[in-house]
Amino acid sequence: YTLQLYMEFSGCMDIVIGAGRLLGVRLPENFCRPFASRNAAEFWRRWHITLGAWLKTYVFYPVSVSRMVKKWNRFGKKHLGKYLTRLGATAMCLFPVWLCNGLWHGPSWHYIFYGMYYFVILLAGAALEPVRAGVIRFFHINERALYWKIPCILKTWVIIFTGELFFRANGLKAGMTMFFSIFRDFRLSVLWDGTLLDFSLDKGDYLVIFAGLLLTAGIGIIKERNLLKGKGLQDMRTPFRWALYYGLILSVLIFGAYGIGYQQVDLIYAGF
């Protein structure tokens, strides 16, 4: 579900940004390879960037300079110390941001829980940051090395996929049922016993999905590591560039879903 949401939303925004550029309008980027993030805070700096920027400007910053936070900082410096003071101020600023994030998607308890889930995750990250920094210093860990980056990315995936489970659920109770069923009904055998074919998808559909994921991941890695040195399609030689254009059009014709019997399905995010 999370990957489908990303493909739809990010792809739609790419179309909008591209159409805007054809008309001479440059729109802000809304996604920046979020699944390469090493923690939840970084993920939300890369995912739905415009919503995050709005919440930061109109919720986080006003709260951070509010009288309540200033009073807390003065009290904390006298009685609590730097660490607890900063953590308390962080909690005061993050809580309304993530409450608004949840309510922005809808006035429902599972959306509120979704926002509070990230509030707890990000606050825990801020609380444990000194521990993380101490571990890195003690063991002389190179944060750019793959042995560190890959586990961090995988850990972030678990956090994000768990959050999106509650986002996808039809209600908070349904979300809890879905979450606990992961542990109660966990079976790796569903990957090869034919269960996956019960979701109205055949082997050809899964092949297309797998190929799309590989292509998306490959392009993401190339852009994340800047392997093209900032060059894009416009920097390619004309024959290669047009061959790629026609190849992309052909891929839509081959893999696209259309024709007799096709029923158009609304984008997931169209509901928001």
Regions found by a protein language model. Give the residues of each.
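Membrane-embedded transmembrane alpha-helical bundles that form the catalytic cores
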Residues: 1-271
